[in-house]
UniProtKB/Swiss-Prot annotation:
The lineage of its organism: Eukaryota, Metazoa, Chordata, Craniata, Vertebrata. The gene is PAQR9. It comes from Homo sapiens (Human). PANTHER family: ADIPOR/PROGESTIN RECEPTOR-RELATED, MEMBRANE PROGESTIN RECEPTOR EPSILON. Plasma membrane progesterone (P4) receptor coupled to G proteins. Seems to act through a G(s) mediated pathway. May be involved in regulating rapid P4 signaling in the nervous system. Also binds dehydroepiandrosterone (DHEA), pregnanolone, pregnenolone and allopregnanolone. This is Membrane progestin receptor epsilon. Belongs to the ADIPOR family. GO terms for molecular function: signaling receptor activity; steroid binding.
Length: 377
């Protein structure tokens, strides 16, 4: 499908200009007629009536006008636009997860108060989950305020996904990885000797891995945000494929759990983690398929403009993946509290998250101030 190369000019719509000799009354009549209709009366636009940066592949109609006011953006969530269900498919999960984390922190009735250091990794993880859904909703609702604000909101959306990914790694590091046989030198050293004949002391290797997990995940979070922001510039031919690939990279932080299931009896020892971990990755594969393939709108452009297009399906399956993740992170927390090691530190949890916020903010600022944004139509 061809794409517009320039935004629609301000004077491309409306009656022709009056002749110089027209009376004042005629000029006033034309001026009144050329005023924008009220928000409720503004029709939705087709793909060739909006700036190129607003056009979604194979989505032909249902576009909102640019610029809209904040009030018009909010009102549009109750109207049949091509962004309406993009909002609701993440706003409803946002409410569900907000309720879930409130119960975990404040209403669980456990012996651990919400401010205990043992719960710091859970706070990091919960903030990532909630921020991701909240930022996605904000980006989809207010993306038609202006071209610059549209870019800013989606940069923030990418940053929130990276923030969530790092928060997940923090939760894994404290709640899930300590329970793996793969990261226990007392288990791995004799295992390698018996299975492979390797006489290797795994103590240093495992210690090195533990020391590098969070720094590497931190660097990946910043790098992924840079790559995704870069994908909104003109050099990127397949931005959706690039963003999908980029956000798959941080999932490698969960490789120890996958290796644990291959080398040891994870299914028998921790069936909750086994089932929900693999089901989560099934949902992620399905979500990636829809995000890259642009099915079903690729098959029948125009039919799924309002309901059923790939981005809505992508939202639904990412929600399901995070739902499963929350389930096994909660189970990992329960096991952690039964025999907790040293309490997580503020600097090793919240401190990392705050530093990441600063770095991601600097990345977004750089891209908003760069000349590449100005060249994007």
């Amino acid at each position: 499908m061809p794409r517009r190369l320039q935004p629609r000019g301000a004077g491309t719509k409306g009656p022709p200009a009056p002749a110089p000799a027209a009376s004042g009354a005629a000029r006033n009549s034309h001026s009144a007629a050329s005023r924008d209709p009220p928000a409720s009366a503004k029709p939705l636009l087709r793909w060739d009536e909006v700036p190129d940066d607003f056009v979604e592949c194979f989505i032909l109609s249902g576009y909102r006008r640019l610029p809209c006011t904040a009030q018009e953006c909010l009102a549009s969530v109750l109207k049949p636009t091509n962004e309406t269900l993009n909002f609701w498919t993440h706003f409803i999960p946002l409410l569900l997860f907000l309720s879930k984390f409130c119960r975990l922190f404040f209403l669980s009735g456990g012996d651990v108060p919400f401010h205990h250091p043992w719960l710091l990794p859970l706070w990091c993880y919960a903030s990532g989950v909630l921020l991701t859904f909240a930022m996605s909703c904000t980006a989809h609702v207010f993306s038609c305020l202006s071209l610059r604000l549209r870019a800013a909101f989606f940069y923030l959306d990418y940053a929130s996904i990276s923030y969530y990914g790092f928060g997940s790694t923090v939760a894994y590091y404290y709640y899930l990885l300590p329970g793996l046989s793969l990261l226990d030198a007392r288990v791995m050293t004799p295992y390698l000797q018996q299975r492979l004949g390797w006489h290797v002391d795994c103590t240093r290797l495992i210690a090195a891995y533990r020391a590098l997990v969070l720094p590497v995940a931190f660097v990946l979070a910043v790098a992924c945000t840079v790559a995704c922001c870069k994908s909104r510039t003109d050099w990127c031919t397949y931005p959706f494929a690039l963003r999908t690939f980029v956000f798959v990279m941080p999932l490698s932080m969960a490789c120890p759990i996958m290796l644990e299931s291959w080398l040891f009896d994870l299914r028998g020892e921790n069936p909750t983690l086994f089932v929900h971990f693999y089901r989560r990755y099934f949902w992620l594969v399905v979500a990636a398929f829809f995000n890259v393939s642009k099915i079903p709108e690729r098959i029948q452009p125009g039919l799924f403009d309002i309901i059923g297009h790939s981005h809505q399906l992508f939202h639904i399956f990412t929600f399901l993946s995070i739902y499963d993740q929350v389930y096994y992170v909660e189970e990992g927390l329960r096991q952690f509290l039964q025999a907790p090691p040293a309490a997580p530190t503020f600097s090793g949890t919240v401190g990392y998250m705050l530093l990441l916020v600063v770095c991601l903010g600097l990345v977004i600022r750089k891209f908003l101030n760069s000349s590449e944004f100005c060249s994007k139509k």
